[in-house]
Amino acid sequence: MALLPDKEKLLRNFLRCANWEEKYLYIIELGQRLPELRDEDRSPQNSIQGCQSQVWIVMRQNAQGIIELQGDSDAAIVKGLIAVVFILYDQMTPQDIVNFDVRPWFEKMALTQHLTPSRSQGLEAMIRAIRAKAAALS
């Protein structure tokens, strides 16, 4: 995830945006930085239910026990939200992910207040799916 900022820089960059149009553009830019997802990873078992857009999230545990996340969506803003979630969960073990509450970060960014209800529900579905997969690994 070298192309993505860390949590603190994400928050700083987000708060520097002058308005919500700039913030949406920044979210879309983050999504464009995600590595390309392989075709074989766009499978039903990696599909996230509860999102209006098509969303795939792949979770693998490396030799050090750290979770590595990959994902994609057919919608630019949703792909950016995937990147935001991946930044928040970067370098975590399965147990870290289960214990980590992303909501304070979303509140600092005022993120959920400016998403449509369907995007907010999709974001919650992504987080639930990642936490459930992490719980199964921990």
From Swiss-Prot:
Induction profile: Suf operon is under both the Fe-dependent Fur repressor and the oxidative stress dependent OxyR activator.
Q: Name one GO molecular function term.
A: sulfur carrier activity
**This protein is called what?**
Cysteine desulfuration protein SufE
Q: Which UniProt keywords apply?
A: Cytoplasm
Report the leader peptide range.
none
The record's annotation in SUPFAM superfamilies points to: SufE/NifU (SSF82649)
Q: Which GO terms describe its biological process?
A: iron-sulfur cluster assembly; metallo-sulfur cluster assembly; response to oxidative stress; sulfur compound metabolic process
Q: Which domain of life is it from?
A: Bacteria
* Pfam families, per the entry: SufE
Q: What is its main location?
A: cytoplasm
Q: In which pathway does it act?
A: Cofactor biosynthesis; iron-sulfur cluster biosynthesis
- Gene name linked to the record: sufE
Query: Where does this polypeptide localize?
Result: Cytoplasm
Q: Which residues form the active site?
A: C51 (cysteine persulfide intermediate)
Lineage of the species this protein comes from: Bacteria, Pseudomonadati, Pseudomonadota, Gammaproteobacteria, Enterobacterales
Assembly information from the UniProt record: Homodimer. Interacts with SufS.
Q: Tell me, what does this protein do in biology? A: Participates in cysteine desulfuration mediated by SufS. Cysteine desulfuration mobilizes sulfur from L-cysteine to yield L-alanine and constitutes an essential step in sulfur metabolism for biosynthesis of a variety of sulfur-containing biomolecules. Functions as a sulfur acceptor for SufS, by mediating the direct transfer of the sulfur atom from the S-sulfanylcysteine of SufS, an intermediate product of cysteine desulfuration process. Together with the SufBCD complex, it thereby enhances up to 50-fold, the cysteine desulfurase activity of SufS.
Keyword Disulfide bond in record: no
Source organism per entry reads Escherichia coli (strain K12)
| Assigned protein family | Belongs to the SufE family.
Which GO cellular component term is one of those annotated?
sulfurtransferase complex
